[in-house]
Every structure is written in structure tokens, then in C-alpha cells.
């Protein structure tokens, strides 16, 4: 059979792989938001999900420039590797970066630092930045497989004038039809990666050869154990007297505030090795490594109701 015969036989039977189908869905959502809203912004933490989302957004408008900025809500308690990767990616891609700093709100007396973790304070800073920049839509990298509150959130998630989310009052989403209707002061959070899994994310990173911060791969690091979780020794996070420091080969499955982000023991130093580890994991990355989700059974939902990512 010639190549022409094969093409003729397969004409009309074009099939997308599941990764390309997810990519097409995400690009459709990104373009829909860009067409429907006046001032969208892409929330960018420097983690794997937001890096994949930025990659998709750039691809959605190529060869043109990204028609909206990216915004990092900076707690001031960051992994240095993540900030370096953020700055490098922004410089390479030529996107406009907006940085909203929690420290600015602490200095101005708008929020009070009562606990070591600044993770809860991000909500105030995020909502202030959305309000000051008059953003009417914000892309988030949340996925439904991460956590049960995120599992029930719509792709277009409506937020009222206070930035709050009501999980009992969500709009229906049929097929690929999304309702972005909102009044002045309200906004929409859009989640292009809603239907992706951690395995999908890593498979796409491998397929597209996307560069990530080095802490996503196995490396030697000084850690200590707290509440069954390995935490990194850092200037913003020190062990207690009864928490001995040990050095292990670890990697991070998710990236957030240093004070509440744990790591896992691992020897996976390449994308293919991480994919193999992910395939046999029985815990989501947030369930395994995020102390902020262990506050209560409804910890994430309570924060999202207040305006969290």
C-alpha cells in the first residue's frame, strides 16, 4: 500500500490522542475567555500547572503576542528555584508580569501575620490585585483530580463583588458552552486544566519538552518530618527541637508557600521517571504534600469560598 492509498483509506478517520484532545479543549477555553472578557489575567505561581497553562496560552495565540498579562501572588516565602524559573520563563516568552506581594499588605496593615504560613493571606492580596487592575477574568491552573472542592467547581467559576465563590450556586455547563455573564465588580475564574490529571500534566510536559523548576525532580535536600510530611529546611521554615534534620533524595509534586509545601522521597530525576512514579501513586499531590489542605476536611472549600485560587 502506497502512502497515498493509506491517506485515502484514513481520510475522514482523524483521531486525536487524549493529550491533544485535552490541549484542544484548554486552548478553546483560553480563546473563549480572551474573546469574551475585557481584562483577563493568567495567575502564575511558577509551578508545573501554571507553566503548562502559560505554554497553552502562548500556543493559543501564536504567532501573535499573549493578549493578557500573567500575575504572581508572591507570599515572600518562595523556593528560590521557582522564582528563578519564573523570571527566566517570563524573559524568554516576553509576557508582561504583574507581581502582587503579600508583604505590601502586611506593611500597610491591611493583613496581620498571625501564623508562620502566609498561604491564607494570599486571598486578600489576590482580590486586591484583581480589583486594582480591574481584571474581570482570571485563569487558574486548578485541576479536578487534585482535591474534592476543586472537583465540583465549574470551568467558568463565578465570583461575586467580594470575590467569593458559592458552590451551591454554580452555573450549568453543557458540552463546551460557558456562561461568562457578570456585572461590574464581579469576575470569573477560568480553569482550562479542569479535566487534566497529574499524569496528563507530566505526559504533556514530556511531549512538549516543557522546562520546569529543578525542585520537581529528585535532588538531595535537608528535610524534617512533621505530621507525617517531609518539609524542607528553609530560612522561613525551621524544625522544632524534637524534629531532627535528615538529608534525603526528594522531589516536590506541587509548589506553594515554603511553610506548607511538603516533598516526597524519590529518585525520579527525569520526566519519564516522574511519569512512572505518578502512574503508581495512590495519593493526589495536594493530599500527599500540602499542609494547608489538612486544616480541616473542608479546608480548601472554605478558602475558595473566601476568594482563594
UniProtKB/Swiss-Prot annotation:
One of its GO terms (molecular function) is ATP binding. Pathway: Sulfur metabolism; hydrogen sulfide biosynthesis; sulfite from sulfate: step 1/3. GO terms for biological process: hydrogen sulfide biosynthetic process; sulfate assimilation. Disulfide bonds: none annotated. Keywords: ATP-binding, Nucleotide-binding, Nucleotidyltransferase, Transferase. Its EC number is 2.7.7.4. It catalyses: sulfate + ATP + H(+) = adenosine 5'-phosphosulfate + diphosphate. This is Sulfate adenylyltransferase subunit 2.
Amino acid at each position: 500500500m502506497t502512502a497515498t492509498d493509506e491517506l485515502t483509506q484514513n481520510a475522514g478517520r482523524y483521531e486525536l490522542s487524549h493529550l491533544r484532545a485535552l490541549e484542544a479543549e484548554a486552548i478553546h477555553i483560553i480563546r473563549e475567555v480572551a474573546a469574551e472578557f475585557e481584562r483577563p489575567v493568567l495567575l502564575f505561581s511558577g509551578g508545573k500547572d501554571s507553566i503548562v497553562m502559560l505554554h497553552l496560552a502562548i500556543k493559543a495565540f501564536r504567532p501573535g503576542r499573549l493578549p493578557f498579562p500573567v500575575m504572581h501572588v508572591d507570599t515572600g516565602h518562595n523556593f528560590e528555584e521557582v522564582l528563578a524559573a519564573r523570571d527566566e520563563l517570563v524573559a524568554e516568552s516576553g509576557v508582561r508580569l504583574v507581581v502582587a506581594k503579600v508583604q505590601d499588605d502586611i506593611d500597610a496593615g491591611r493583613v496581620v501575620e498571625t501564623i508562620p504560613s502566609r498561604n491564607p493571606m494570599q486571598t486578600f492580596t489576590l482580590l486586591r490585585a484583581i480589583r486594582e487592575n480591574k481584571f474581570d477574568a482570571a485563569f487558574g491552573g486548578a485541576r479536578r483530580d487534585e482535591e474534592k472542592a476543586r472537583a465540583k467547581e465549574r470551568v467558568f467559576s463565578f465570583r461575586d463583588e467580594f470575590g467569593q465563590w458559592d458552590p451551591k450556586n454554580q452555573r450549568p455547563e453543557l458540552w463546551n458552552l460557558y456562561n461568562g455573564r457578570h456585572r461590574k465588580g464581579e469576575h470569573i475564574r477560568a480553569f482550562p486544566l479542569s479535566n487534566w490529571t497529574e499524569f496528563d500534566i507530566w505526559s504533556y510536559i514530556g511531549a512538549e519538552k516543557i522546562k520546569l523548576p529543578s525542585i520537581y525532580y529528585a535532588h538531595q535536600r535537608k528535610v524534617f518530618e512533621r505530621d507525617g510530611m517531609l518539609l524542607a529546611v528553609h530560612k522561613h521554615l525551621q524544625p522544632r527541637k524534637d524534629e531532627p534534620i535528615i538529608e534525603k533524595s526528594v522531589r516536590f509534586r506541587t509548589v506553594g508557600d515554603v511553610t506548607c509545601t511538603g516533598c516526597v522521597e524519590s529518585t525520579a530525576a527525569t520526566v519519564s521517571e516522574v511519569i512512572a512514579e505518578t502512574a503508581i501513586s495512590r495519593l493526589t499531590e495536594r493530599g500527599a504534600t500540602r499542609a494547608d489542605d489538612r486544616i480541616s476536611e473542608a479546608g480548601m472549600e472554605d478558602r475558595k469560598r473566601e476568594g482563594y485560587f
